[in-house]
Amino acid sequence: MVHPVQVGKRTRMSFSRLKEVGQMPNLIEVQLDSYDWFLKEGLQEVFDDINPIQDYTGNLNLEFVGYKLDLDSIKYSVEECKERDSTYAAPLKVKVRLLNKETGEIKEQEVFMGDFPLMTEQGTFIINGAERVIVSQLVRSPGVYYDMTVDKTGSKLFSATVIPNRGAWLEYETDSNNIIYVRIDKTRKLPITILARALGYGTDAEIIEFFGEDERLKATIEKDNTKTREEALLEIYKRLRPGEPPTVDSAESLIESLFFDAKRYDLSRVGRYKFNKKLAIHLRITNQIADQDIVNPQTGEILVQKGEKIDKDKAIEIQNCGINEVYIKIDDKSFKVIGNHFVDIHSLVPFDISDLNIKEYVFYPVLKEILDNYADEESIKEEIRKNIYRLIPKHIIREDIYATINYELALSYDIGYKDDIDHLGNRRLRSVGELLQNQFRIGLSRMERVVKERMTIQDQEVITPQALINIRPVAASIKEFFGSSQLSQFMDQTNPLSELTHKRRLSALGPGGLSRERAGFEVRDVHHSHYGRMCPIETPEGPNIGLINSLATFAKVNEYGFIETPYRRIDPKNKRATNDIVYMTADEEDLYVIARSDEPIDENGYFIDDKVTVRAKEEVLVVPVSEVEYMDISPRQLVSVATAMIPFLENDDASRALMGSNMQRQAVPLLKPQAPIVGTGIEYKAATDSGVLPKAKNAGTVVYVSADEIRVRRDSDGGIDKYKLLKFKRSNQGTCINQRPIVSKGEVVAKETLLADGPSTDLGEIALGKNILMGFITWEGYNYEDAMLISEQLVKEDVFTSIHIEEYEAEARDTKLGPEEITRDIPNVGEEALKDIDERGIIRIGAEVRSGDILVGKVTPKGETELTAEERLLRAIFGEKAREVRDTSLRVPHGEAGIIVDVKIFTRENGDELPPGVNKLVRCYIAQKRKISVGDKMAGRHGNKGVISRVLPEEDMPFLPDGRPLQICLNPLGVPSRMNIGQVLEVHLGLAASKLGWHIATPVFDGAIESDIVDCLRKAGYSEDGKTVLYDGRTGEPFDNRVTVGYMYILKLAHLVDDKIHARSTGPYSLVTQQPLGGKAQFGGQRFGEMEVWALEAYGAAHTLQEILTVKSDDVVGRVKTYEAIVKGENIPEPGVPESFKVLIKELQALCLDVKVLNDDNQEIKLKESVDEDADELEVNIEGTENQPEEKEEKEKEDSDEYDDLREEDVEPDLEELSLDDLDLDDFGDEH
């Protein structure tokens, strides 16, 4: 039944029936933990990989001994970095040791290796003043993958791919003649026996003896024309290095370096783990019949007798006592199974070695050697430490290759299984730490080359580590990664939810990943292994669908980069659900039978029903209780945070839920946030983890509260913690960040208590929109096709008003002709335009500005021309001051307006770091209050989006029997075909809850059901169907039928009409075609395309058509004359020839076709090449292109991955659209 739940400072009435076991992890731990790992272990690994650097003679040795990030000498705090456009970073200092082997001299130095960007507490980076997020990348895990295809004759053909982290690939394939081929590093294919010979089994007899009798092997040997190891080596060398003279030695060293050199071939920890998992012998012999006695080589005891079935425990025992070859019986044939000889070290070493921290399997021959040669505990441990890279090799070894070949042979006997590459057990996550590590490795290897060169060039006696090391390549690769990698994205800061989701995003794109064009349908599809790991709902619509995903609420990432999800253990003895929680990867989960979290259990954890619905791999089955092994821990574990915020998600169609999840991220923070009446209970957790809210670092008592600062006296030592609040700051997306205190003086706070609300939060809960009284009713066609009719009350009472802040900057640079100057003294500008400009030439704070107003007065020196006598005279009289300058002031762009809220000035004198050539930088911040208006886009949480079509006076809106007018009318036809019934349930429950004064939590898949809603309506005194009589506000008459009315949570989205509306009379033109540019950012025109031309042709509107195709577009002469005629009030002249026609003729002439234009009398018409000289007297530039207003926003769009809804023509102001001002056309008319 409904029960109260305390969420922060608010009580919600919850409808959940399940007691949740286990806590949701910190929602941004993916970012924090990964970066933490990088600083503690990742960096060290890279240095270990590269140590030591030797010169070509082997005399000098350079080693990186240790490193530290100098956190005490961070230049600026996070806030200062944002203000000063600098990077939040700490210097990385590395201890370097140089050993000269000849003289035995050792030199040690601490070397500065560049500033290393630090992660903020919120999981972001500040790079050049912009807050950025590194998105985690989903890639194929290194490992061995087998696949099967069926050919025309119906026979099964098996293939395999051996994928390292970096290094040469091996690919096996079988053709229809049963011959097995191998491709080494994507070259032409060779019979696989050539590879086997080259690795050591030279003759046919050796191969057959080692791999066992097999039809396909024999067919391959027949095809193979090499017969010895030497021949095989030469054959491989010819394939890999065509054109070089083959010798056996060079072939041997090629194979060695290709596969068995740790610097060239790296499996990585995860690759070794996947190899050992796939190639372990125990998996393939479990449940098979032994064809020979299997004897323990240490003790001589018979483990399995011939003809006996091998069970799972026996199979593991066989593997761990070092047996690597087992004969099994299949269809009366004997088949030899070969493993890769790795064993569990803990079962073989007789004492406890947990302090060595070895989690992986180890290579048995090396371990046996150690155990045979040493007896006492200490020396064995010491030897294991010394030989760790032989025990757990980082590269592939011969045994691995033999095992992969054997697996390929075994598949045709139905031993082993093929892999599904879209399974999350075979895809792993590269998070910040690993991406950074790879980048750092690239930088270090570039540096290694430089060091080696310097070692040979410089004098070995006086050389120092500092002189050898050049940190440029390292610093450059890190900078390149943060600045321009596809995975380093400009943070989506529209609201706290969009921040949080951006940090939890998983992308399959990026370097080393997929590309949009190549990604097929399978990769994008929902897979059964996504359950509890990746959200099946939240993904963008458009070309990236399914390639960009979101982490599920309870998911964690393990040390290998695989995503894990938690399950409750079911006690195997008495089959009761325990509170033990186990995190499992996707391939572990496939081994178990897992019950739903809402399966009925009693208070002791026993199942109530005899039969239970379960998941086993991709099947959903009903099984007896005795077979259940685990149980989900929460119904919301399969969805992401944004999706878990949709109430009644279970009643919505999936595609609408997808839109609902995505649109919540676009909700603009409103002036007065309001938490939803009908929530899901996850709002508090999402807001607290998103990083926008200040929390108490220590327990204590609040001693001071003001709008911009909170002070807390610590309980521990009586000291004071100060918390500065952000006031009206601009976010990355231009929305407003403002924090408001929610504690009062004297309040006692515990550690981690929220002290203030941020943008879009209300008492610590995410509050993206408003609770609005609405009804499903049509009104005079104004809500046709998803349009919305709203009441003027929403405008008057600032219900949907938001604040937007834009930043504009002007810089004074040094030019060839002298420095630019920021000044109030601007040529040809009247006093009226300068009324709000102070004596420095900068606008005052608080001034109201409109488009075209000056923000920063700036003049640039003009080029010197030959002076006339009069000018020389003036120069002589007035001195230098009459020198020509032109006005290049920063003005408010077209269509913008607002109030100046802040001005920042950076100069060299004040010690600010400015880019080279810049003397002074001024930033102005303009704030606008945007009320809701016609054309704004609004949406509910169920994918029900619409555009406002009309703002109706309150008195005309339909009203309830108690006289309250509705605030919004939605079209009832928007519900049935879209199947998002959740919105109707939300409206009913909202109606009852607002009357009862409740806030409600109805968690996804575990929320209120129909009977609960009916009970609430009854309790609130409404009719049970949730409908009521509505009266027409204009006539006072009741409408014919009763109408569903209630409270719905509605968001105002970032697609605001003010940003989209755009008009142009004249403006920039494309250079080649002379047609107007397109798009608001380029101040372009409206495209009149092919189909629009057909429409005019169809109605015979010849003059309109001619005008549009010529003087309004690319008839250069005509448009100047036309403008002149309009200004002077004369008739519009005849149009001339469009520029694109001239371009067409030039194209044809470029193809060597002699094209001429003839008139009726077959006389050639000369096409004028340029504008009439006299047409340029007007003070308007029509033939050239204006400087295009470049909006910062556009650059940011490019940075982020969100340009799903941009069309190509919106983005590409191509090379040909350079502005004419960039060209040096001094004689091209007046300067304007």
UniProtKB/Swiss-Prot annotation:
Keywords carried by this UniProt record: DNA-directed RNA polymerase, Nucleotidyltransferase, Transcription, Transferase
Task performed by this protein: DNA-dependent RNA polymerase catalyzes the transcription of DNA into RNA using the four ribonucleoside triphosphates as substrates.
Enzyme Commission code(s) on record: 2.7.7.6
Protein name listed in UniProt: DNA-directed RNA polymerase subunit beta
Subunit structure: The RNAP catalytic core consists of 2 alpha, 1 beta, 1 beta' and 1 omega subunit. When a sigma factor is associated with the core the holoenzyme is formed, which can initiate transcription.
One cellular-component annotation, GO: DNA-directed RNA polymerase complex
Chain segments carrying region Disordered: 1170-1232
Domain of life: Bacteria
Taxonomy of the source species: Bacteria, Bacillati, Bacillota, Clostridia, Eubacteriales
Biased composition (Acidic residues): 1171-1180, 1199-1232
A biological process from GO: DNA-templated transcription
Basic and acidic residues: bias regions: 1189-1198
SUPFAM superfamilies: beta and beta-prime subunits of DNA dependent RNA-polymerase
The family this protein is said to belong to: Belongs to the RNA polymerase beta chain family.
Pfam families (alphabetical): RNA_pol_Rpb2_1, RNA_pol_Rpb2_2, RNA_pol_Rpb2_3, RNA_pol_Rpb2_45, RNA_pol_Rpb2_6, RNA_pol_Rpb2_7
Catalytic activities: RNA(n) + a ribonucleoside 5'-triphosphate = RNA(n+1) + diphosphate
Database matches in InterPro entries: DNA-dir_RNA_pol_bsu_ext_1_sf, DNA-dir_RNA_pol_bsu_external_1, DNA-dir_RNA_pol_su2, DNA-dir_RNAP_su2_dom, DNA-dir_RNAP_su2_hyb_sf, RNA_pol_bsu_bac, RNA_pol_bsu_CS, RNA_pol_bsu_protrusion
